[in-house]
Amino acid sequence: MMDERKLSNFQIDGEKAYTGSSQGNSYLEDRQKRQNTFTKRKAGIFKKANELALLTGSEVMVLVVSETGLVHTFSTPKLENVVKSPEGQKLITESLINATTDQNESQASQAKQSSAQLSDSESGYPLDHEEMRISEENGPSHIENLNFFSDIDNFSKTSAEEIASKLFSSVSPTHETLQFDHGLQNLEGFQANEHPEMFADHSIDFYNSNNVDIPALSMLTSQTSSSSTLNLPPEPASREVKIFPKQGKRIFSPSTGIDYETTGQHSVNSPPSTYKHRRSLNKSFATRSEPQTPRKNKIRDSLQSSPLNFPPRDRPPLIPISRIAVPSTIETEERQYRGNQKIINFYAKIFEPNSGLGTSSEGASSSFPDVDPNLAQNGVPYYSLPDIDHNQFDHLRR
């Protein structure tokens, strides 16, 4: 089901599981970089697996185990039971245990072969190299290798039992730290809601603490086989905290004309935000944005005092009011007289005495009916103009 090379990267008891390859990839010493790399690469693998399933119609299942012991899985609908059912989870844990055991056994066999080759090579040393052989045996590196080779058998057995107990404790129904992780929910530009049947991502928390006493493997196996349901921990009850602000102190600033409230310190039940300065609704004062001038003050006073709310004018109108509605006076009559005098001069130039018109009462009355023959004296005509303005200057002497 899984490649042994990938399973060999599974970290055991905090040791480095991946030493790198000849292409330049090496184990990241920084923990933060390791976590970021794991998250990005895992998302990329799940995305490629989903594209493969959608484009080719194949059934895909991906299983990724982090260094903390968290299993991330992705599967198509037909393989969903493999990672979702208790039997599938048990199969995954057994596969991981077997792979880890095989890895330890292979390491132990390699160590035994290397120790046997070392003993054979040491027995075949010539007598001339006896001193060199003694110095190598007494060296610190050779002693450490022998101690490692002697402990490799015990290590393979104990590590396999510990890993098996931790794996089965996570799958057991009494385990309360069972975690589920969806590998494709955090992918950018990936529509997980369009194909809900394609995702079956579950996570198993292998171990959360190294100080927990783990029971025997047989007890955990019996508990797992006897039960078929999982007991999840209850969700914590939601707590509602009511927030009440403190009563601010109201202050009026005469310079700015603003009535505002102070923003004092807030208690635990108060909101983290502050109140903005607000103007009073029943008062209107001059602010800095509207500078006051004598003309504006005059307009403001007139608006408050005038019932019609009509501000007075600071300059006279373009048309004098006396021309609109003013009783007749002597000055107005004189202005009308000057205007009529121009008309009289115009008619006098037309009807000159030398032209024979108006020299006598007959000629004047026949030629110009407006000439008054009764007022003609010594050949000087008097004209009577139409009463245009209804004034007393009807008869004017030339």
UniProtKB/Swiss-Prot annotation:
Residues 262-273, 282-294 have a biased composition (Polar residues). Gene3D superfamilies: Transcription factor, MADS-box. Residues 20-74 form the MADS-box domain. It is found in: Nucleus. One of its GO terms (molecular function) is DNA-binding transcription factor activity, RNA polymerase II-specific. Pfam families: SRF-TF. GO terms for biological process: induction of conjugation with cellular fusion; positive regulation of transcription by RNA polymerase II; regulation of transcription by RNA polymerase II; signaling. Disulfide bonds: none annotated. GO terms for cellular component: nucleus. Residues 1-30, 101-125, 254-317 are annotated as: Disordered. Residues 106-121 have a biased composition (Low complexity). The keyword Transcription applies. Keywords: Activator, DNA-binding, Nucleus, Transcription, Transcription regulation. In response to mating-pheromone signaling or nitrogen starvation, it interacts with mat1-Pc. This activates the expression of one of two mating-type-specific genes sxa2 or map3, which leads to inactivation of the P-factor. May also interact with mat1-Mc. This is Pheromone receptor transcription activator. It comes from Schizosaccharomyces pombe (strain 972 / ATCC 24843).
